[in-house]
Amino acid sequence: MKKILSFCAVLLMACSVNAQAQTNAQQNVSDAKAGQAQLLPWETPRDTTCHEVLLETTLGNIRVALYNDTPHHRDNFLKLVNSGYYNGCIFQRVIKNFMIQGGDYSCRKVNLGKVEKFDVDYTVPAEIIYPKYYHKRGQLCAAREGDDENPTKASASTDFYITWGRNFSPRQMEYYVEKEKREGKSYAIPSAELQQGYIKYGGVPHLDNGYTVFGEVLEGMDVVGKIQNVATNKENNDRPLDDIVITKATQVK
């Protein structure tokens, strides 16, 4: 009888341990999901009145929101979307652990026999709102010519990129800051608050305060992740070996 009772006690203890482990695992998953939704103390909630655009690509869909406090870029992007310009554009430049870039006029794939004319010979005035908008992972940003040709940092009319960047541990962020200090790049050192943002989200801090960030990815970061992982031709300006096409861009809000 004692042996039976001892066995039952061990069995109950094992069941209790397993149940607690499952509870802890479920709690960890819940905490992780909650953490993704939680903002850092200095962050402000996204403006829910923002216009939204759905980019349907050959690797999946990406839904983006356009910031209202970058109105020139918002309106320009919506104009291009609603004119059909982005239908047939490709992501022509992709760099792993950095960003994916699309929208270049010279790389559009149009249907044979279809005549399309778009006026893209213009720039968009810079709307750099830093540090409110910085280059954390998943930001929609405007490409541009370099500072020598473009000291005002005006954006290209059609080219955009979505950030991916790298993940930072606290020690890696410290190392990054130390490196930028040694190289005299004080302009590339994020504030203490932004350092916490890069540790939480990942991103590309050296682009901060140099390019206009005008939106963010709402859905489809898994697709962005797939795109930034594709094989590319580094001798052809990092163009993917197989074209990744934006088959359709639609304003959905």
Language-model features, listed with the residues they occupy:
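Cyclophilin-like peptidyl-prolyl cis-trans isomerases
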Residues: A19-K253
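Bacterial Sec-dependent N-terminal signal peptides
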Residues: M1-T23
